[in-house]
Amino acid sequence: MDLRPELPTVSSASQVHPGAAAAAAAASIPVSMAGNLLRGPPLLLRAADKYPRTPKCARCRNHGVVSALKGHKRYCRWKDCMCAKCTLIAERQRVMAAQVALRRQQAQEENEARELQLLYGTAEGLALAAANGIIPPRPNYEVFGSVNSESNSESSIQKYELFPKTQLSGSTTTQKSVGKPASTESDSAPGMSSPDGRHGGGSGSENGDSESFINSPVSKPLKDGEETPGSVSSLGSDSGSETDKEEQEPSPSSAASRHMNAIDILTRVFPSHKRSVLELVLQGCGKDVVQAIEQILNNSGAQAPNKAGPEETWTAERMLQSAQQPPAGSATAATTTRPMLPGAMTLSNRSAFSPLQPNAPHFGADPGTYPLGTHLGLNPLRLAYSAHSRGLAFMTPYSTTGLMPTLGFRPPMDYAFSDLIRDRTMLHKEQGYASGLYGPLVNNTPDKQ
């Protein structure tokens, strides 16, 4: 619509008569434009409507009936209709319900995550994640550094020291006494062990293995200047071979040096034992230093160092016999294979499945020996189990009827050989239980003197 030709006429008419000019302008505007100017916005018209729009039933609308939805769903006449339009409406309702349920679940999960974050905070969450292994720990939490690191203090190394300083110095002297080929091989050891040291410093906090644990005491003598790199090469190659034992087998030279170190440790821990005996025990234990030390302590703990020659050889044979036995899978099976040494088993560490020594009051002798007379003609195997020990609680099916397993028993020799030995042994009269089979504690009768 173009109003340009009409503008001059309007201006001229306004100059002639103002009322006529206004009438001419109103007559020149089209009717559609006048209607748009006089009509209000649609929101105002809907708000001004007398009857607002209410939701209607879709099934009824499909069938040409208009009905309000409020209170109508249960009583709709087409609620079970299976026509195409009603089926489409049912599918739409199902999809909308699934979407609403999914949104509710997502909102609930977000709220739970927000609550956990507010509850634990950022620092605690990182600490828990690092403890669970999700996030690698930070470098300032590292306890053990590499072999060549100078940052670790003397106190932190002393706290986690595996071998004493004297043992390390002693082992280095023996390494020096072996010969010069060890030093020539160790000249190239720092170059080869430097990546291992860097690897141990980087992965010690991630893997938490014991290789960096072993490396930390080695770095202390290296910093003090007491030893050369050749003397440390034995322990360095030892820890390096343990680090890479999953990938490749250790070399024979490293195995020999490990064996020599084990022998040196055993000789310094047990200076009273012969080196050949210690080598046999270590070989029987599969070159395990800890197991060999346990065997020697269990077998020779209660014996004096100044024993006679035959007694010492007998102890060595017993130690070798116990060391050559195969390692058992469980603790109870391991206790069955331990040999019985005189005086080695006291009341505090007796096992239920190992033979016990006879009681001193019953046989009138020192508990560290077997004081059976030669006139009895009995070997020590007849003395199966003691009378008052907790080991009999497990052996009652084999010794007695087992009615009261935890109380005192008569000794086996007291009733097994009552007609033959009771008058000839050195049994005390007050120790014999004449009131019954199980003694005064079970029969509730005073002991007859």
Curated annotation (Swiss-Prot):
SUPFAM superfamilies registered for this protein in UniProt: Cysteine-rich DNA binding domain, (DM domain), UBA-like
Keyword Plastid: no
Any one of the GO CC terms: nucleus
Ranges annotated as biased composition (Low complexity): 230-240
InterPro entries per UniProt: DM_DNA-bd (IPR001275), DM_DNA-bd_sf (IPR036407), DMA (IPR005173), DMRT (IPR026607), DMRT5_1_DMB_dom (IPR046472), UBA-like_sf (IPR009060)
Polar residues: compositionally biased ranges: 166-187
Tissue expression: Expressed in brain and eye.
Gene3D superfamilies: DM DNA-binding domain (4.10.1040.10), DNA helicase RuvA subunit, C-terminal domain (1.10.8.10)
Keywords (A to Z) from UniProt: DNA-binding, Metal-binding, Nucleus, Zinc
DNA-binding region in chain numbering: 57-104
An individual GO BP term: sex differentiation
Span of domain DMA: 260-295
Gene Ontology MF term list: DNA-binding transcription factor activity, RNA polymerase II-specific; metal ion binding; RNA polymerase II cis-regulatory region sequence-specific DNA binding
Region (Disordered) location: 163-259
Subcellular location: Nucleus
SMART domains in the record: DM
Family: Belongs to the DMRT family.
UniProt function note: May be involved in sexual development.
Protein name per its UniProtKB record: Doublesex- and mab-3-related transcription factor A2
Gene responsible for this protein: dmrta2
